[in-house]
Amino acid sequence: MTQDSAALIADMDQARAELWQIVAALDPEIDVCPGWNKRDFYAHIAGWEAIVYEVFLYNTTGTPLKDYPYNNLDDLDAANAGFVAERQSGTEDNIKLECEINRYAIKRMLNDIPVENFDKPIQFPWGKLTATKFVQDAIKHERDHAADILKLQQPLT
């Protein structure tokens, strides 16, 4: 891992910490995003990161990717609904823990990518990305969620 990749991963950690702080302050029953309470929001994150974990596992060990019923990730609404539905029986704390375990595993895999491979394309279900681009996109995704949640929580004027 290079200093640049370590800094990117640190930024990814910071974006997650900021997002978690915002979500933690919310009532469990209010909408974090339209139609999603906190548990559903964590289920969304857990679902996507489970796929990312599998992609990195496949790229390092050749372990086949799981076949999801909504594998056409061009339909993001169906994928997100699937992630939430899969976790309906889980508690908010357990689903958040799944997020944290997935993120830990992803970071370990990122740390194990040789420097010369960090900018090689990796096939994700939604397209090819380098590890660098994946981390940049993860940071943006979490910061976008944080901004959207804060905006949704603002009183109407």
Report residues per predicted region.
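A non-catalytic, amphipathic alpha-helix used as a structural packing/dimerization or gating element
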Residues: D11-E18, L97-A105, K140, D144
